From Swiss-Prot:
Class of this enzyme: isomerase
Taxonomic superkingdom: Bacteria
Identification of the protein by name: L-erythrulose-1-phosphate isomerase
EC number(s) on file: 5.3.1.33
Gene Ontology biological-process entries: gluconeogenesis; glyceraldehyde-3-phosphate biosynthetic process; glycerol catabolic process; glycolytic process
Biological function: Involved in catabolism of D-apiose. Catalyzes the isomerization of L-erythrulose 1-phosphate to D-erythrulose 4-phosphate.
A GO molecular function held by the record: triose-phosphate isomerase activity
Organism encoding this protein: Pectobacterium atrosepticum (strain SCRI 1043 / ATCC BAA-672)
Keyword annotations: Carbohydrate metabolism, Isomerase
Listed Pfam families: TIM (PF00121)
Keyword RNA-binding: no
Active site (record annotation): 102 (electrophile), 174 (proton acceptor)
Length: 259
């Protein structure tokens, strides 16, 4: 069987209610338990639910091939930070991943590259794998997109590198202009950007294992079209239907068999 890296992740953002999240996770658990993709050593599956559901979701997936992560974390490990959650607590409760750098954090909460550098360092310091989102705001040339993403990656890793921290990293390429749209960015465009990022990521100090996934209106067929340019997909609303997530798993497994 192929050792090709394959990663499928889902962020539920704030779309689901509490019970709806638990019901969805139960269905995903049932799918993953029986799907051949989940048994591949090189496959990674993760879900990022809302904070109030993390404890029961971690418990639900405790004996499952699906890992759980958070959609954010604070950059310090404890202290008087009302409303915040530390990487220390996330790791203690069983989280494996944490999302950092999403465009919505920039747009709605004023977060900057400096915040993302602090959070990336906090994630590695606490044994969490950052799902680091990068992407250009406006569509231009692929080289402009590559330059933007590489600059965002360098900024996010800057502090962790200074502190000589190491860890795994999932780099999620999400062109901001494609997030929430009805169609993803053109396949050739995504492929060129992700290929460049895939070659660039191993050169970054501190990154033990790096994976490149695409997000931004990702759906069925895209993984096959992108081929080796990406290691997987970062899914949003499409995966709200468990059957749709199952279809993406089918596609990923087929690709692993052909590699």
């Amino acid at each position: 069987m192929s050792s090709r890296k394959l990663t499928l992740g889902v962020s539920l953002k704030m779309y689901f209610g509490y019970q709806q999240t638990l019901d969805w996770c139960q269905k995903i658990h049932e799918i993953a338990e029986q799907h051949p993709l989940a048994s591949l050593p090189s496959a990674r599956l993760f879900v990022l639910p809302a904070f109030p559901t993390l404890a029961p979701v971690v418990q639900r997936f405790a004996q499952s091939p699906v890992h759980v992560g958070a959609q954010d974390l604070h950059w310090t490990d404890n202290g008087a930070f009302t409303g915040e959650v530390s990487g220390t607590m996330l790791h203690e409760m069983g989280c494996r991943y944490v999302e950092i750098g999403h465009a919505e954090r920039r747009r709605y909460f004023g977060e900057t590259d400096e915040h993302f550098a602090l959070k990336t360092a906090a994630a590695w310091r606490n044994g969490l794998t950052p799902v680091l989102c990068v992407g250009e705001e406006q569509r231009g040339s692929t080289q402009q997109a590559i330059d933007t993403c590489q600059a965002q990656l360098a900024a996010a890793l800057n502090l962790a590198q200074k502190q000589q921290l190491t860890g795994d990293l999932v780099l999620a390429y999400e062109p901001q202009w494609a997030i929430g749209s009805t169609e993803p960015a053109p396949t050739a465009y995504i492929s060129e950007v992700c290929q460049a990022l895939k070659q660039h990521l191993p050169t970054q100090a501190g990154v033990r294992e790096g994976r490149i996934i695409y997000g931004g209106s990702a759906g069925p067929g895209l993984l096959s079209q992108l081929g080796d340019a990406v290691d997987g997909l970062f899914l949003g609303r499409f995966a709200h239907d468990p059957a749709a997530f199952n279809a993406i798993m089918d596609e990923a497994f087929t690709l692993s068999s052909q590699a």
